[in-house]
Amino acid sequence: MAAMECRDKAVVPPRRLVQARLPFKRLNPVPKEKHDAEAEGKKGKCSKSGLGQSKDSSTDTLHASTDNMENDCQLNSDVNFVPKLVNGKGPLDHFIQKSTKDNTDEIIVIIDSVDESNQRLSDDVDHVSFDSKASSAALTNGMLGKDMNKLSCLNSTQNSQTDDSMQTDVPCEAIANKGEDLVDGIQSCSGLTERNNLENTKVNQSELKDVIFEGKMPVVLLEDIMAAKSPQVTSLDGSVTSENETVELSHEGDSVLTNSSLSSLSVSSPEAQPVAETKRNTSPLAVSTPVRKVSQKLHKSSAEKEKLRLQRDQERADKLQKLQAEREEKGRLKEEAKAAKERAKEEAKKKKEEEKELKERERREKKEKEEKEKAEKLRVKEEKRKERQEALEAKLEEKRKKEEEKRLKEEEKRINAQKAEITRFFQKPKTPQAPKILAGSCGKFAPFEIKENMVLAPLCRIALYPDFLEQLDRLLRAQNSEVSFLRDLKCRKPRKTGPTFVNSSTDTVNSDVVVVDNCKTDAVPERGKFGRMKLLQFCENHRPAYWGTWNKKTTMIRPRNPWSKDSKLLDYEVDSDEEWEEEEPGESLSHSEGDDEEEGEDEDDDDGFFIPHGYLSEDEGVTEECDPENQKVRQKLKAKEWDELMAKGKRLHVLQPVKIGCIWESAQNDSGTNADLKILQQFTACILDSSVAEEEQQIQKCSKKRAKDQQILGQLLPLLHGNVNGSKVIIQEFQECCRQGLFSDVTAATDCGDTSPVSPNTSRPQTPVGEDSGVPSKARLKRIISENSVYEKRPEYRMCWYVHSEVLKSFDQEHLPVPCQWNYITQVPSSGKEDGGSVPGVAPVQSTPVSVKRKSTGSMCITKFMKRPRDAEQAEAMEMDGFQADTEEDEDDDDCMIVDVQPCKDSTLTVTETAPESRGTTAAHQDASMVSPSNTV
């Protein structure tokens, strides 16, 4: 049994303590003598049935969980715990009322009933075989009434000890030994009472089996039968004293076991089987011992047992208190540990949160720091960029200022060069001044300036001949102290040399006139005067190579030291290649002037004066310190002129100056002198006398001119006033009318008058217009129109020509209609018709063909071969709103045409018109296909 408890302790958890229910008596008890036999029989049956039922239920309850045990036990107790009444008696009545009164001192029956599940009983019954003989002996020999109170107290202490033994670590071996002692005592007692109770057991066995274990309510029955012990087993008395400590009927007192059942329980365990076999072998000895001896020993040891029992009770109480204190201490420690664990958990959580917050703060601070550093870096970078930008802008501004200054200087130099180029022909060339040379090696004399036409005299004027030098050497070798050199000097006559003359080579170079005798036409200046031409060129330089003369000589650079530097002659710190800048192309002065200069150029070409490219005059060879750029501009202009002349293929010849000396009157008859006189006569000065007649003629001419203008204006008023066309159309129409003789008065007036002067602003006329033909010039008509009328917009009509009111009044032409009603004889542009509008009374346009015989080919109007767009004329007419339509300059430009008549293979005309740039028209080239057959040559 003890071994079983050791095995079940690990499986079944500790149970809570339940107060034991003490046995009670019925109010109407049945006599004990009547039911002794029935009790013995029922007890035997109960043990067998309990054993069988416990074996079946043990397998199910072992696997049940601890939570479902109490529920199952409570369910079973509610349903099946109601025992069947036999003759109005329950199962407890059979145990309380016993008929064995003779052996009351020897047998002690203990009944313990606790309200608990029968799981513990099922576990115990699996290991116990119920002995019906032992149980019947216990019932017959038991004495219940005498020791009921004592046994109940003992039973309660045993139950408490059993509960304590489940929670404490009692060795399984001690419990097993105690169980073996208890088995021996029970077996001896069962042997004494076997014969007496055999019949009662058989009678009541069936009833006890049905009553006791019905509903699985176990009752524990213990019998202390130490009196039946034999003398041979007296050595086991020590173990009997502790039998009450180890015997356990049930976990809470719900099972019923006898001493024989405990013996069978201990025998069924593996540890107690050998001991049980030995006891069985010795059981006949125990049965054969007298009962009186056993009872005497039991009486003797009862006092000792009582003391031991009290001592054990005290120990158990102390142990219970100690266990209770330990349990409370454990609970308190557990609570403290739990509280400490909770605190540690809270602290860990708090610490973790603090660490997390700290990390978050550090991360935020780090991020803010990085952002600040980044912002600082960006600010520094932006400041640096701004500084660089400002420095770059300052540098660019400085560079721009320098370029502006340089451009202004170059512009000023260019203007000065142009002025100098123009005025160079009217100024006398300056003679180059000789460089200032200071003579500082003249002994006691102070340094002085060597002026022009001056040279230094030689230090020694005496010419040392070889004979004199030999004599000097001889005298030096044969020196005599007696001979005095001073005496020789006094006796010697002084030597003489010629005067010092200025080098004549400078005169030939700097002379203004060079007489060339028998010079060829294509001769080139002599190179001996200027030195050899040299080319200084380096492949790694951007600066153009130098091709010219280099007459400077150095005393520092020699063949033995070619890498030495001559700082006096050259400046090694300045890199001329870096200072080189590509110059802009200069303006060509050859075509800057008007067409009037072309005639002058043709006349200048006849002079035969030409300077070849690369030729340096006397004044050009000298570098001016004040204006070094002027010479470059001149050279560029001369180079361009040279290229232009070479392109034209003009002949080059060297100028031959002529010197004519004085001519005497006596030598006039000489043929050579007469030729010179003819040359000089063209430059003869003439005395001119001013006369009054010329002024009067000029006044008369002006008066005639004004009168003629008035006559022309009188005939022009009907055509001019209210005309929407331009001045060009009006002038063309008026001239055509004059050619056809429509204005007889004007023609007659022009015939008797002088020729009208041509305006200086007019260029070549389109047709040869003059007084011989009776047609006024275009410039004259244009001047008259501009002086007496204006092209503007008025309420009467839109844009047209309006003659001044005073002019109309002076000619009595105030009634002229607006627009004009003129019958045109020439072709008028369509824009004029549209501008004029369809006014009733206007005659249709009449296009009278002009005979080719009356006009030369050069006098034909080029506009006949052109078709100007209608929109262009309308745009021109609308743009002149509020302003004078045409000016003299505009009309002159319009009429400035170059008509080139070239004979072709097909005998056709090729007409080219060059329109001025001011009107924005393009040149029109007409093929022969656009010329009518009548105009062919």
From Swiss-Prot:
CC terms in the record's Gene Ontology section: CAF-1 complex; nucleus
One Pfam assignment: CAF1A_acidic
Cysteine pairs bridged by disulfides in the record: none
The organism's place on the tree of life at top rank: Eukaryota
Residue spans of biased composition, Low complexity class: 255-269
Disruption phenotype: Cells lacking CHAF1A show delayed S-phase progression with retarded DNA synthesis and defects in a rapid nucleosome formation of newly replicated DNA.
Compartment(s) where it occurs, according to its Swiss-Prot or TrEMBL record: Nucleus
Main location: nucleus
Polar residues bias locations: 59-69, 756-766
Keywords annotated in UniProt: Cell cycle, Chaperone, Chromatin regulator, DNA damage, DNA repair, DNA replication, Nucleus
Biased composition (Basic and acidic residues): 31-43, 301-386
Disordered as annotated region, ranges: 21-69, 250-386, 574-614, 753-778, 831-851, 910-937
Signal sequence bounds: none
Motif PxVxL motif in this chain: 213-226
Family: Belongs to the CHAF1A family.
Protein purpose: Acts as a component of the histone chaperone complex chromatin assembly factor 1 (CAF-1), which assembles histone octamers onto DNA during replication and repair. CAF-1 performs the first step of the nucleosome assembly process, bringing newly synthesized histones H3 and H4 to replicating DNA; histones H2A/H2B can bind to this chromatin precursor subsequent to DNA replication to complete the histone octamer.
Subunit composition and interactions: Subunit of the CAF-1 complex that contains RBBP4, CHAF1B and CHAF1A. Interacts with CHAF1B, PCNA and RBBP4.
Free-text comment about domains: Contains one Pro-Xaa-Val-Xaa-Leu (PxVxL) motif, which is required for interaction with chromoshadow domains.
Name used for this protein in its record: Chromatin assembly factor 1 subunit A
Organism: Gallus gallus
Annotated gene: CHAF1A
